[in-house]
Amino acid sequence: MRDRDRLLAAFSKDTGITLKPEQIAMIEAYTGLLLDYNQRVNLTAITDREEIWRKHVLDSLLLFLALEIPPAAKVIDIGTGAGIPGLILKIYRPDLEMALLESQNKKVAFLKKAVATLGLQGIECLWGRAEDIGRQKNYRESFDLAVSRGLAGMNTLAEYCLPFVRVGGFMIAYKGPGGEGELNAAARAIEILGGGTKKVWRGSLTGGQEVRQLIIIQKEHPTPPVYPRRPGLPAKRPLQ
């Protein structure tokens, strides 16, 4: 715990983001549940508690440095896996109306267990593919923000995320040092899908040297009805 507390103190000094004791307790409970489930379901390759804090929890929170999120914003985490970053964002900002979208049912079962265990309200766990859910009236162009971490390249990710975002809203992709290059290569695809203004936030993970880029895209036009294409196509044949 001393290592964790030192890490949190350093993160707070670096970013100005400070977790409350009750939030730390909730994330510790989540971490315990994650490691227990991970013995049966492949949720994370990181099994050291301090590294979970550093590479999953604190990394997720960098979003709040990249973009000001208004109160009670509607947020969807696409390809959330074990709930990263969406679950962490919700714990830090309980006012957010959060949806966690995951295509693997076993992982959705874990997410539902985690949400129930932590007593979180205003959070929905969705089982399905972005290509299908993004066409449903209840979800299409209804979110202020769509986020995704480590799911796909920017061409593909834009087709997964932008159909969920309302005009004027944003998508944010968590990327490493190659993020800006991916963004440049995906410029036309982003424009086709309704994206407009683009920005790159640059930083690094507290306690390490890993470079982090958050790709921020504002949606300026409705996504054409033909997108997203049928399941599998955005990954197999990314828009160019």
Curated annotation (Swiss-Prot):
UniProt-annotated location(s): Cytoplasm
Major site of localization recorded for this protein: cytoplasm
Annotated Pfam families: GidB
One Gene Ontology CC term in the entry: cytosol
Binding site for S-adenosyl-L-methionine: G79, A130, E131, R149
Domain of life: Bacteria
Keyword field contains rRNA-binding: no
Record family assignment: Belongs to the methyltransferase superfamily. RNA methyltransferase RsmG family.
Name the UniProt record assigns to this protein: Ribosomal RNA small subunit methyltransferase G
Organism this protein belongs to: Moorella thermoacetica (strain ATCC 39073 / JCM 9320)
Gene behind the chain: rsmG
